[in-house]
């Protein structure tokens, strides 16, 4: 079982590397890692489990965050309508996105970042992601709102990008052009 001890923190060079594509069909080792990742995210949202194992609640995790430089992400998040998006994916890729942008009014956080980084993180309002599910099926997801933001955050990790790289350095709370805030 993964715990916070397995989550590497900012400053570790793995977080700045571009992760490798996962060879498909996925090996047993990669499948096990991805299963552990989605279990970690789900467990972190369960108050009892989070307390028992000292887990910081999270809604997404990318393999580089546990020291595995491979293109794998786990997301477990509910949108504004209460729809659950729970996905464990290999080789996710954003294949299209809206022109319109959004940002979380409270900013973003990250399990690999132990400090608060104030500022708006510009994200696309809508994205389409293509990936391979943990069961080996090709999936295409059309996402908007919080799920779209979470997927962009996790896919950034696969490209060595941290959320705070997107924050305007001169004016952290400048609303990005063509954007509307998303409240969480």
From Swiss-Prot:
One GO MF term attached to the UniProt entry: peptide deformylase activity
Cofactor note: Binds 1 Fe(2+) ion.
Active site location: 154
Key words of the record: Hydrolase, Iron, Metal-binding, Protein biosynthesis
Keyword Coiled coil appears in the UniProt entry: no
Signal peptide feature range: none
EC number: 3.5.1.88
Reaction(s) the record says it catalyses: N-terminal N-formyl-L-methionyl-[peptide] + H2O = N-terminal L-methionyl-[peptide] + formate
Positions of Fe cation binding: 110, 153, 157
Gene Ontology BP terms: co-translational protein modification; translation
InterPro entries named in the record: Peptide_deformylase (IPR023635), Peptide_deformylase_sf (IPR036821)
UniProt superkingdom: Bacteria
Cofactor needs: Fe(2+)
Pfam family, one: Pep_deformylase
Main EC class the enzyme belongs to: hydrolase
PANTHER family named in the record: PEPTIDE DEFORMYLASE (PTHR10458), PEPTIDE DEFORMYLASE 2 (PTHR10458:SF8)
HAMAP family membership: Pep_deformylase (MF_00163)
Similarity annotation: Belongs to the polypeptide deformylase family.
Functional summary from the UniProt entry: Removes the formyl group from the N-terminal Met of newly synthesized proteins. Requires at least a dipeptide for an efficient rate of reaction. N-terminal L-methionine is a prerequisite for activity but the enzyme has broad specificity at other positions.
Name of the featured protein: Peptide deformylase 2
Organism per entry: Bacillus cereus (strain ATCC 14579 / DSM 31 / CCUG 7414 / JCM 2152 / NBRC 15305 / NCIMB 9373 / NCTC 2599 / NRRL B-3711)
Source taxonomy: Bacteria, Bacillati, Bacillota, Bacilli, Bacillales
The gene coding this protein: def2
């Amino acid at each position: 079982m993964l715990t916070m001890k397995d989550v590497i923190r900012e400053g570790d060079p793995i977080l700045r590397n571009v992760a490798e594509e996962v060879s498909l069909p996925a090996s047993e080792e990669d499948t096990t890692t991805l299963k552990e990742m989605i279990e970690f995210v789900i467990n972190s949202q369960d108050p009892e489990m989070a307390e028992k194992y000292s887990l910081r609640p999270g809604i997404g995790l990318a393999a580089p965050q546990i020291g595995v430089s491979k293109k794998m992400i786990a997301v477990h998040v509910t949108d504004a309508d209460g729809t659950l998006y729970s996905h464990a994916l290999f080789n996710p890729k954003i294949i299209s996105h809206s022109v319109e942008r959004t940002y979380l009014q409270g900013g973003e956080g990250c399990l690999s970042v132990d400090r608060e980084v104030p500022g708006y993180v510009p994200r696309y309002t809508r994205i389409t992601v293509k990936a391979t599910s943990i069961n080996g099926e090709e999936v295409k997801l059309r996402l908007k709102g919080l799920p779209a933001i979470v997927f962009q955050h996790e896919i950034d990790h696969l490209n060595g990008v941290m959320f705070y790289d997107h924050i305007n350095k001169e004016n952290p709370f400048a609303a990005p052009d063509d954007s509307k805030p998303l409240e969480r």
